[in-house]
């Protein structure tokens, strides 16, 4: 039985692990996995990734409390991919989610991260035929699914569990409150006794604590509080630039019509940051550029210069979107819409923290319109078309 688990208050667990790894490069990940991580758009690990990836890779049972939008899926997906033996063509990691939509979303993330690896991922969910399951389960190394369908397949002997070494429960609180408790318990009993258990949950009700007591061995406990970011006080606009090639012209036109002390411009790739920096410098703008490959010392110098006002424009990848406060910035420009929806609030929150007002302008191509509508839905917000009197908004 896991020591001390039953004494934890329902609202929050106590962290008992304090190791933090700040860079993916320092996690000793498989080279092809690392390529997938950077290719997916992750640059620097989020708070939960800095704390939970390593203990999972090391084989500890892990109980992590974190809200959605903190990088949980990336956490257990990266750790699971690192632990998979690619030479074994049988299920080695089982990931459970409360809904088929979430299971499909997880499968998509795992497959993207495993793009350069020889790993097969099967989604075991309702709405597909058992024949498809039988095919997919034969040689998939990672299975993502909903409890009912997974249990059904194990019972029908389509899903061999003898090689399973990791059992991951995402959104455990939701899963247990949705009446899956019995099935989850039954699945547990059908896995090898040495299976590592990883449980992620936003809250810690008794149902979840009971599972940890029954099935986890001295788990590493990690609590990550979500950044209290809000879009309040930030005016959000978009400019339809139609095609990618018109973005630069639009940016310089914008700068001709407004007077801004400082701005942060976000691009999705290092290459784009470098290209934009060169163009703006050629047009006599004072620009700094920052991305994750830069040595820490150089990054610190660039940030210092920007804070002191000696450069007016800071161009960055999503590295800056978390954890670096630039309080004096009143304008954020998303030259590219973020690849991950969660990064939107981290990017534009720059100008709006500490009660300061801010303006965010999104450059949107015809292809981006759908993604922008998704952002509006995700954050229950509205992004208006940029008005012609933009200058008055920034003064």
UniProtKB/Swiss-Prot annotation:
Q: How does activity depend on pH?
A: Optimum pH is 6.0.
Q: Which residues are noted in the entry as ATP-binding?
A: 66-73
Q: Name one GO molecular function term.
A: RNA binding
Q: What is the effect of changing residue 49 to A?
A: Reduces ATP binding and ATPase activity in vitro
Q: Which residues carry this modification: N-acetylserine?
A: 2
Where do the Helicase ATP-binding domain residues begin and end? 53-222
Question: Motif Q motif, which positions?
Answer: 22-50
Question: Which residue intervals define the domain Helicase C-terminal in the entry?
Answer: 233-394
Claim: Plastid is one of the keywords in the record: no
What keywords would UniProt list here? Acetylation, ATP-binding, Cytoplasm, Helicase, Hydrolase, Initiation factor, Nucleotide-binding, Phosphoprotein, Protein biosynthesis, RNA-binding
InterPro entries (UniProt xref): DEAD/DEAH_box_helicase_dom, EIF4A_DEADc, Helicase_ATP-bd, Helicase_C-like, P-loop_NTPase, RNA-helicase_DEAD-box_CS, RNA_helicase_DEAD_Q_motif
Tell me where in this chain the PTM Phosphoserine is found: 77, 129
Q: Name one GO biological process term.
A: cytoplasmic translational initiation
Task: Note the superkingdom of the native organism.
Answer: Eukaryota
Where is the protein localized?
Answer: Cytoplasm
Q: What is the effect of changing residue 66 to V?
A: Lethal and dominant negative if overexpressed in vivo. Impairs ATP hydrolysis, RNA-helicase and translation activity in vitro
Positions occupied by motif DEAD box: 170-173
Q: Which GO terms describe its cellular component?
A: cytoplasm; cytoplasmic stress granule; eukaryotic translation initiation factor 4F complex; plasma membrane; ribosome
Q: So what does this one do?
A: ATP-dependent RNA helicase which is a subunit of the eIF4F complex involved in cap recognition and is required for mRNA binding to ribosome. In the current model of translation initiation, eIF4A unwinds RNA secondary structures in the 5'-UTR of mRNAs which is necessary to allow efficient binding of the small ribosomal subunit, and subsequent scanning for the initiator codon.
Q: What else is known?
A: TIF1 and TIF2 code for the same protein. Present with 106000 molecules/cell in log phase SD medium.
Q: What is known of its domains?
A: The Q motif is unique to and characteristic of the DEAD box family of RNA helicases and controls ATP binding and hydrolysis.
Subunit comment: Component of the eIF4F complex, which composition varies with external and internal environmental conditions. It is composed of at least eIF4A (TIF1/TIF2), eIF4E (TIF45) and eIF4G (TIF4631 or TIF4632). Interacts with eIF4G1/TIF4631 and eIF4G2/TIF4632.
Put simply, this protein is called ATP-dependent RNA helicase eIF4A
